[in-house]
């Protein structure tokens, strides 16, 4: 499993040092970094990372308030938050927000490794607790529908709803958001190539270069389905496809 990690740090040198440490780990995919709290909130919603290394003292909204927003307003209880700060005084608040770790700057490579081990242990525990299901229950406007995830080609966010496209060309619409659907399908080979799409990797027919490092992909049996793959998501998709087909 690749771990998608985002850094929020306003000091360039500290940000680059942390990026360097993360790049030495072979199971990490680095999302774009944020330099302040508002930028982090925007990037978080777009890239949906597993882990955030979060500086506390940043311009504008500070790291503690950002974490509270993610936990409460976005109702993301699973995101792993690692606070990085030069101050010991925020330990109690970090505990209340259920941070996985609290790194005091400057921290050593050995201390960083301890944090990474905690991240992996937390993720593996969540993975064990999440059973794979054979069927998926989707709430439609007036009924509940039981579907076979293997028959889903892709799902696309359209406004406040998500349209699920089956390889039979049937389409259903649900008010479940794309992140919820992704979590329900965690035991199946689905990948988020773009903030507005979720695709079944077993149903990908072809992937073609587009521009600026981005790609387009086509789902087999759904000829009209050209789905964008963002530049930042492309490497993760190729890594995931290798894992599925080997």
From Swiss-Prot:
UniProt modified residues of type 4-aspartylphosphate: 55
Main location: cytoplasm
Locations listed in the record: Cytoplasm
SUPFAM superfamilies reported in the protein's UniProt record: CheY-like
Molecular function via GO: DNA binding; phosphorelay response regulator activity
Family annotation (CDD domains): REC_LytTR_AlgR-like
Domain HTH LytTR-type: 136-243
UniProt key word Phosphoprotein: yes
Cellular component terms (Gene Ontology): cytoplasm
Post-translational modification: Phosphorylated by LytS.
UniProt keyword terms in alphabetical order: Cytoplasm, DNA-binding, Phosphoprotein, Transcription, Transcription regulation, Two-component regulatory system
Keyword Translocase recorded: no
Source organism, top-level taxon: Bacteria
Pfam family, one: Response_reg
Residue stretches making up the Response regulatory domain: 4-120
Its biological purpose: Member of the two-component regulatory system LytS/LytT that probably regulates genes involved in cell wall metabolism.
Record-given protein name: Sensory transduction protein LytT
Organism: Oceanobacillus iheyensis (strain DSM 14371 / CIP 107618 / JCM 11309 / KCTC 3954 / HTE831)
